[in-house]
Amino acid sequence: MELNNKSLFKQKCFINGEWVGSSSGETLEVNNPASLEIIGNVPKCSVSETKKAVDDANTAFQTWKETTAKERSVILKKWGELIIENADDLAKIMTIEQGKPLAEAKGEILMGASYIEFYAEEAKRVYGDIVPDPRPGKRIVIIKQPVGVVGAITPWNFPNSMITRKCAAALAVGCTTVVKPASQTPYSALAVAAVSYTHLTLPTIDRV
């Protein structure tokens, strides 16, 4: 597989800004569904790695939740732009591990970027409300706040767009994320993380 940006093909998990293996050293084979050829191996993560990812994401949440809606919007827009810039490579990775024709894979990459663009705009529209109170002289004020760490489990058949659809929504409102991609298609998820790690402040808030 020839990529313009070889740094997008990762064979380790992404936790707290670092590429790490499993504590046990165990790995899972990833196969090309067309040829059954082994593409590579990724860490077989256990409870300990999962707990570390969630704990680190919760630590990052304390800072991320304080960012303004505008700041989050700008970062998400840049993330979407970077995915579009790397669309050809991301499509190649998807095709070799998932089996979609290259044109269809690229279509999914662009669809995934459109989800990020959508939520980048929605980040600025998380409004509260004022509700009439049944008691005289009083009003009910509603505010919306980020809830914490969001776990995103994503399928093999849309290995890119379901990540961006879930994570962009969570990040837009100030939550941090931990992603569990399908074991058949981990490289698309890791490539999305690699894009954010290389160019954005997302390494502290997005884990795979």
Spans of features found by a protein language model:
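Glycine-rich loop-to-alpha-helix module at the N-terminal edge of alpha/beta enzyme cores
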Residues: 37-126, 137
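Single conserved hydrophobic/aromatic residue that forms the stacking wall/gate
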Residues: 199-208
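Rossmann-like NAD(P) dinucleotide-binding subdomain of oxidoreductase/dehydrogenase enzymes
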Residues: 128-200
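Conserved protein kinase catalytic core
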Residues: 22, 38, 161, 186, ...
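Active-site phosphate/pyrophosphate- and oxyanion-stabilizing loops and adjacent acidic/basic residues
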Residues: 17, 92, 194
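Signature tryptophan residues that serve as conserved aromatic anchors
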Residues: 19, 61-64, 156
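Terminal low-complexity tails and localization/encapsulation signals of metabolic enzymes
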Residues: 1-41, 74, 78, 128-153
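Hydrophobic packing residues within well-ordered alpha-helices of enzyme cores
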Residues: 116, 189-192, 208
